[in-house]
Amino acid sequence: MSYKQTTYYPSRGNLVRNDSSPYTNTISSETNNSSTSVLSLQGASNVSLGTTGNQLYMGDLDPTWDKNTVRQIWASLGEANINVRMMWNNTLNNGSRSSMGPKNNQGYCFVDFPSSTHAANALLKNGMLIPNFPNKKLKLNWATSSYSNSNNSLNNVKSGNNCSIFVGDLAPNVTESQLFELFINRYASTSHAKIVHDQVTGMSKGYGFVKFTNSDEQQLALSEMQGVFLNGRAIKVGPTSGQQQHVSGNNDYNRSSSSLNNENVDSRFLSKGQSFLSNGNNNMGFKRNHMSQFIYPVQQQPSLNHFTDPNNTTVFIGGLSSLVTEDELRAYFQPFGTIVYVKIPVGKCCGFVQYVDRLSAEAAIAGMQGFPIANSRVRLSWGRSAKQTALLQQAMLSNSLQVQQQQPGLQQPNYGYIPSSTCEAPVLPDNNVSSTMLPGCQILNYSNPYANANGLGSNNFSFYSNNNATNTQATSLLADTSSMDLSGTGGQQVIMQGSEAVVNSTNAMLNRLEQGSNGFMFA
């Protein structure tokens, strides 16, 4: 039993069958018993590129290595006849590289060997120290899929054999090599890992995709990889909008060769890389469903605020240099999505950028966190949406009105009686008025020592209960002591000394209290 292997020439960009090429491999029936050829003989009825077992994944590459470096490494190991597909950073949709950022690889590549036997022998060198690089070891594994060209795009294979998942909440420092190794160590059918990068800055947008060739392992990954930590952050996984859609580009997912040439697909949607592109006749369904690209895992949501509100699309930029203008700020954040407005308050050293959708805002926060703008590293967070701001202002106004209503107004003092006018002279008590009588007394006799010729009494009265009253003060109260009626005083309570009358006020007060009087002497 023998097979002719299809050989891929990157320079030509198509598949040809070359019986005389050095890649032509004849697998005898004796090889069928070799353990090194098991993968190459599995599914022998559908032999094609990437399934013949002649391709290896090579990871843990130095960022500065290129194809020539990898070729030299394998040449020193006795494998000179290889083809290397290097995965580069900052690759744009048209296949060219971005001018921003250094030319670094993504930490891994794919190596094609002349036959599965060569690939199996090379795999035995896994963990070996790399010649001329004493601090590096070979990190090898089987690659279960190939690529269609040297520009880092995936080969258009049957959609039924490819299943992909969405991976979100990636740390900014996660590389595609780390993401691929996370899944390949658990699921052997992992074929490719893709992290979406910004076309201008080259920074990760915080999400990507992992492709499998086995749908069962894809379903296992959806259930087992939820919340797995990668570089200190728990990742989120979810299915894509359709299991028949797959990645067709390296950065923000390039247009597939034939399915998008004749279709006017929304360029803003393509720039976000939010869905895998379809093949064949699935273009119309792709355009109808591009508004719901991903199915995120259902989780219990906390109470809504400007951090968790799904309708909030405003990004707060702190630590902003005062030299940055709104147009410059817009240029930095434009690659993440369509911007509604950009605002930089005067003298606040901060700014606000509002996007059309929340996914763009999330990508901006993940991609621009700590990014230097005008020699100042910015810090990003969620800003308040217009709805939240309006509700906050309304709540503050309502609270202020409620506080004003609760504060009592200034009130005039309330009296239990009507105060007499200060200009009116006091009126002497009337013996006939019973309301003036004290409890326990039936009749109170009042004497007026100040009666004048017309029979009217003087209104100038002063009542003293001071024990220290002088004789002069006591005498001043009595106009004519000889005419006073002292019969009610008991004799011993008023001491007459010539023209002066001294009132023994203490004894008089005590006696009158015992008799039910008010304790004062009325003269």
UniProtKB/Swiss-Prot annotation:
Residues 1-35, 239-260 are annotated as: Disordered. One of its GO terms (biological process) is positive regulation of mRNA splicing, via spliceosome. Keywords: mRNA processing, mRNA splicing, Repeat, RNA-binding, Spliceosome. Residues 24-35 have a biased composition (Low complexity). GO terms for molecular function: mRNA binding. Residues 240-260 have a biased composition (Polar residues). One of its GO terms (cellular component) is cytoplasm. InterPro entries: Nucleotide-bd_a/b_plait_sf, RBD_domain_sf, RBM42_RBP45_47-like, RRM_dom. Gene3D superfamilies: 3.30.70.330. Disruption phenotype: Affects the meiotic recombination and the formation of viable spores. CDD domains: RRM1_NGR1_NAM8_like, RRM2_SECp43_like, RRM3_NGR1_NAM8_like. Residues 54-145, 163-242, 313-385 form the RRM domain. PANTHER family: TRNA SELENOCYSTEINE 1-ASSOCIATED PROTEIN 1-RELATED (PTHR47640:SF10), TRNA SELENOCYSTEINE 1-ASSOCIATED PROTEIN 1-RELATED-RELATED (PTHR47640). Component of the U1 small nuclear ribonucleoprotein complex (U1 snRNP) involved in the initiation of meiotic recombination. Involved in the formation of DSBs at recombination hot-spots through meiosis-specific splicing of REC107 pre-mRNA. Collaborates with MER1 to promote splicing of essential meiotic mRNAs REC10, AMA1, MER3, HFM1, SPO22 and PCH2. NAM8 interacts with the pre-mRNA downstream of the 5' splice site, in a region of non-conserved sequence and is required for efficient splicing of uncapped RNA precursor. Present with 1480 molecules/cell in log phase SD medium. Component of the U1 small nuclear ribonucleoprotein complex (U1 snRNP). The RNA binding domains RRM2 and RRM3 are required for NAM8 meiotic function. Within the U1 snRNP complex, the RRM2 domain of NAM8 is positioned to bind to the intronic region immediately down-stream of nucleotide +13. This is Protein NAM8. It comes from Saccharomyces cerevisiae (strain ATCC 204508 / S288c). The gene is NAM8.
